[in-house]
Amino acid sequence: MFNRVVLFLLTNFAVLILAGIVMSVLGVNPAQMSGLLVMAAIFGFGGSFISLLLSKFMAKRSTGAQVITEPRTQTERWLVDTVRRQAQAAGIGMPEVAIYDGPEINAFATGANRNNALVAVSTGLLQHMREDEAEAVLGHEIAHIANGDMVTMALLQGVLNTFVIVLARVVGGIIDSALSGNRDSGRGFAYYIIVFVLEMVFGLFATMIAMWFSRRREFRADAGGAQLAGRNKMIAALERLSLNHGQNTLPSQVQAFGISGGVGEGLRRLFLSHPPLTERIAALRASNGTAM
């Protein structure tokens, strides 16, 4: 947690420096932008952290996941016991364990912190994966929690949101002034249209950055799953996923934390939260099952 706080502070410091440079280049006095920066930070980080705090509730509600409070079957008992064992090995609190109805082979983890998380698997995973493969998938999700990926993604998204809000308004103000001949007549309707368009454009670039980080995060979670369950099991699980052609039924807010992501070529790959399965398998085969 301390490392993520340091990363958060350093990232914000870097963003402030970059914002100051951008404003200087554009001829904007940063001292006049303090109100905008505060507003942008409140909205940028506020939305991200509200989503993080509500992530378990929203995930359970949107997927219909049923938390296992008292195991009723051998499969449920195995799930709970495996998650407990892996959580202890990873040094995190025992997550809630749930099953949701979905035909695809998938699982996800979410939660506000390492000791208040949820691990859920699809019925399709339980039907189509062997026990050793499912163990590796659970290890992958436990690694996400142990690595603090949900918190880190929220911090990153907050920084990106803040930067998009500020930059869109700074650039929008400059364009509006140029179009109006620098007349000091206040902000017109055109300014808000320009800001809206710029937020969409800058938001696309911000999404690319967030998804790039998410793809790096998946490789690390694969390595963590290999450490907890075994590299061969993790490879076998990903190979099984590569044969899964079912539609991803996970809601968009939790898809980034599933074991299985979308597929795409060309520019579409820049917006994917998961690397291609072939690359993930190759990375595991080239590794030595290093730590999370």
From Swiss-Prot:
Residue ranges spanning the membrane: these are 5-25, 34-54, 155-175, 193-213
A single GO cellular-component term on record: plasma membrane
Query: Which EC main class describes this enzyme?
Result: hydrolase
Q: What is its EC number?
A: 3.4.24.-
Looking up InterPro entries in the UniProt record yields: HtpX_protease (IPR050083), Pept_M48_protease_HtpX (IPR022919), Peptidase_M48 (IPR001915)
The record's cofactor note says: Binds 1 zinc ion per subunit.
Q: Which UniProt keywords apply?
A: Cell inner membrane, Cell membrane, Hydrolase, Membrane, Metal-binding, Metalloprotease, Protease, Stress response, Transmembrane, Transmembrane helix, Zinc
Task: Look up the domain of life of the source.
Answer: Bacteria
Give this protein's Gene Ontology molecular function annotations: metalloendopeptidase activity; zinc ion binding
Q: How does it sit in the membrane?
A: Multi-pass membrane protein
Q: Which GO terms describe its biological process?
A: proteolysis
Binding residues annotated for Zn(2+), in chain numbering: H140, H144, E218
Give the principal location in a single coarse category.
membrane
Short name of any one Pfam family annotated for the protein:
Peptidase_M48
Cofactor(s) annotated in UniProt: Zn(2+)
Instruction: Give yes or no: UniProt keyword Translocase.
Output: no
Which residues constitute the catalytic centre? E141
* Compartment(s): Cell inner membrane
Q: Which HAMAP family match?
A: Pept_M48_protease_HtpX
Family that this chain belongs to? Belongs to the peptidase M48B family.
What is this protein identified as? Protease HtpX
Q: Which gene specifies this protein's sequence?
A: htpX
